[in-house]
Amino acid sequence: MQLTLWTYEGPPHIGAMRVAAAMNGLHYVLHAPQGDTYADLLFTMIERRDSRPPVTYTTFQARDLGADTAELFKRAAAEAYARFRPQAMIVGASCTAELLQDDPAGLARALGLPIPVIPLDLPAYQRKENWGASETFYRLVRALAGPPAARPARAVRSCNILGPTALGFRNRDDLREVRQLLDRLGIPVNVVAPLGASPADLARLGEADFNVVLYPEVARAAAQFLERTHRQPFVEIAPIGVRATRAFVEAVAARAGVDPAPVLADEGSRLPWYARSVDSTYLTGKRVFVFGDATHAVAAARVATAELGFALVGLGTYAREFAREVREEAEAHGLTALVSDDYLAVEEAIAAAQPELVLGTQMERHIAKRLGIPCAVISAPMHVQDVPARHAPQMGFEGANVLFDTLVHPLMMGLEEHLLAMFRDDPEFHDGVAPSHLGGTARDLPAAAPQPAALVWAIEAERELKKVPFFVRGKARSNTERFARERSLPLITVETLYDAKAHFSR
């Protein structure tokens, strides 16, 4: 067992809760101790939902372990049905209750409820949250989608949209953008699931001609099942960035039998022109490290390199089930992917890569802050500030605009650097002190890594080093000292500084 202060994913029953909370008319009866009710806060606090997720906990306590905990579950399930009258119910156990081996599936079946009861077998000690969401959605689709039915020939084929859940990164806004794209193409949407769907809606999934998978982490297994049983092909292109959105539009248009040209001719994204118009000194070649779930990490890496001209120096994911996709993308950039859910390993990799920008999760925001590196959150897990009240998608052409702002705004642009150069030697405003209205206390700059042997810097070289922007000054210092040490130079001069810069720029 590994003790940690942070985890990228919760146990699999949290994934099941994300699916249940996204749907209507579905209730989740969870065999869990009293302490596991903390999960409600993920939805009411982080996502700021105005209602609790549709979950009934058995909430057994220590004193109940000497009695019949199975009876507790049966009573909770019966009361949940009587109170909420759902169209369907899912039942399962949390990681703690799994140890009791009470068999929630068999207990619920014995109750003989007049609705579908779908048991969930979520091995909490082998799997995690995203897998739990995928397995839950797959089980629901398998149980409720109904037998395959003949579909009439149509001039324009319809689709289902699969994947968006509660507590997903910008899922609500992404769905709005994708629906607008499909509307502009004239493609009818049959069902959106899990978000906003009911069990009755899942029974209509087979009426569509194909499926659109927005988030493979959640919907790939269900889409593969529908492809096998209902002969529904699926499109699995995450439309994140201008290029991916164009590819998505062409793919769904081909499946539906419509012309994508009108939509592509009027895409309305400002990212391509903005990326070309920004001074390349402050955009092109910026070193970026990307980490997150597979869908968002791979997409962010492609946008950063192909559309903004950044240099990718690190790519990784915490989602082991999708490690192959991330490794393939990393290899395309000449990198080795980091596949780990240990935030300390991620911090070590970021520090070693010395990026100028980090794109990651809420944890990478903390890591980057400690290292003094700009950061933008592009993937779950996220915190409350990453669930904005405004419309802020990542998908579609408007999502590309949002993504441009997200990736570029943390960077220091030309005017800001020019102002720093103007006031570098000012006793009140130079970058070695905090803002004057905060009392002028010294800035806690990230210290350079300790070196085995002390090196002497000439006064002129130190003065020249201060002209380097503070957020890459540590990197410039360490590279120069490494250059001097490798050549046994006793004194670092201005010439040494520029020789080192030329050496490491090759």
UniProtKB/Swiss-Prot annotation:
UniProt entry keywords in alphabetical sequence: 4Fe-4S, ATP-binding, Bacteriochlorophyll biosynthesis, Chlorophyll biosynthesis, Iron, Iron-sulfur, Metal-binding, Nucleotide-binding, Oxidoreductase, Photosynthesis
Alphabetized GO MF terms: 4 iron, 4 sulfur cluster binding; ATP binding; metal ion binding; oxidoreductase activity, acting on iron-sulfur proteins as donors; oxidoreductase activity, acting on the CH-CH group of donors, iron-sulfur protein as acceptor
One matching Pfam family: Oxidored_nitro
Residues annotated as the enzyme's active site: D279 (proton donor)
EC annotation from Swiss-Prot or TrEMBL: 1.3.7.7
Residues spanning the signal sequence: none
Binding site for substrate: G414, L415
Reactions performed catalytically: chlorophyllide a + oxidized 2[4Fe-4S]-[ferredoxin] + 2 ADP + 2 phosphate = protochlorophyllide a + reduced 2[4Fe-4S]-[ferredoxin] + 2 ATP + 2 H2O
Cofactor(s) listed in the protein's UniProt record: [4Fe-4S] cluster
Gene3D superfamilies: 1.20.89.20, Nitrogenase molybdenum iron protein domain (3.40.50.1980), Proto-chlorophyllide reductase 57 kD subunit B (1.10.8.550)
Domain of life according to the entry: Bacteria
UniProt pathway: Porphyrin-containing compound metabolism; bacteriochlorophyll biosynthesis (light-independent)
Disulfide bonds: none
GO BP terms: light-independent bacteriochlorophyll biosynthetic process; photosynthesis, dark reaction
ATP-binding is among the record's keywords: yes
Residues bound to [4Fe-4S] cluster: D36
Function of the molecule: Component of the dark-operative protochlorophyllide reductase (DPOR) that uses Mg-ATP and reduced ferredoxin to reduce ring D of protochlorophyllide (Pchlide) to form chlorophyllide a (Chlide). This reaction is light-independent. The NB-protein (BchN-BchB) is the catalytic component of the complex.
The family this protein is said to belong to: Belongs to the ChlB/BchB/BchZ family.
NCBIfam families, per the entry: DPOR_BchB
Identification of the protein by name: Light-independent protochlorophyllide reductase subunit B
Gene this protein is translated from: bchB
